Amino acid sequence: MSDICDANKLKHRFRGYFPVVIDVETAGFNSQTDALLEIAVTLLKMDDEGLLGIDKTLHFHIEPFEGANLEPEALAFNGIDPTNPLRGAVSEKDAFLEIFKAVKKAQKASDCHRSIIVAHNAAFDHGFVSKAIERCDLKRSPFHPFATFDTATLAGLAIGHTVLAKACIMAGIPFDNKEAHSALYDTERTAELFCYIVNRWKTLGGWPLLATSESEDMDSEE
């Protein structure tokens, strides 16, 4: 029983990694040259039954870094006007200092030793986040430098679809395409999808794994 209770702690679910769901909106596809315009970060928590859920979300509009490229097609797609003063945009550095503070606090509270980015098509978001952190010369990032959890891959395995909107609907998660391509909306839907997949795997008996010692005991009894 104690082993099962221990497995229900977040620190043991992903080998000490604290999952942080992230979505970014950008002014193009090139993380080195194109502006990061919006970021949302959803922190997760695990209940006493070992079920994963949303804790809270941070959201920032970002000022384009100096010399950043702004692709017109990307701006038309996400509907962001970087010059609009009503965005209340902050610098990359200010945003990431707040993100680091919140992530490290939640990571510590969960007894995890590092955080790992969860995102839909995670290589894209991870690339922009990593490049922004590098530009800001921020040290001691809580995020793993290359490992991620990609919900496109996980959804393809667990649900049979890789498109965020369709995967959410198939999982019973409401999705409004009119709200899509907002970092705030997309990260919370991605978080719900990730939690659904992790919790579904648990309810189907995939977690916790049978302890090695228990397996050996069963073999000896046979």
UniProtKB/Swiss-Prot annotation:
Cofactor(s) named in the record: Mg(2+)
Keyword ATP-binding in annotation: no
MF (Gene Ontology): 3'-5' exonuclease activity; magnesium ion binding; nucleic acid binding; RNA exonuclease activity, producing 5'-phosphomonoesters
Enzyme class at the top of the EC tree: hydrolase
Listed SMART domains: EXOIII
Domain Exonuclease: 20-194
Pfam families on file: RNase_T
Cofactor binding annotation: Binds two Mg(2+) per subunit. The active form of the enzyme binds two Mg(2+) ions in its active site. The first Mg(2+) forms only one salt bridge with the protein.
Residues involved in Mg(2+) 1 binding: 23
Catalytic residues (positions): 181
Catalytic activity, EC: 3.1.13.-
GO biological process, one term: DNA replication proofreading
Record carries keyword Nucleus: no
Site (Important for substrate binding and specificity): 29, 77, 124, 146
Cellular-component GO terms for this entry: cytosol
Record-listed Mg(2+) 2 binding positions: 23, 25, 181, 186
Keywords: Exonuclease, Hydrolase, Magnesium, Metal-binding, Nuclease, tRNA processing
Function description: Trims short 3' overhangs of a variety of RNA species, leaving a one or two nucleotide 3' overhang. Responsible for the end-turnover of tRNA: specifically removes the terminal AMP residue from uncharged tRNA (tRNA-C-C-A). Also appears to be involved in tRNA biosynthesis.
Assembly description: Homodimer.
Entry-linked HAMAP family: RNase_T
Listed name of the protein: Ribonuclease T
Organism: Shewanella oneidensis (strain ATCC 700550 / JCM 31522 / CIP 106686 / LMG 19005 / NCIMB 14063 / MR-1)
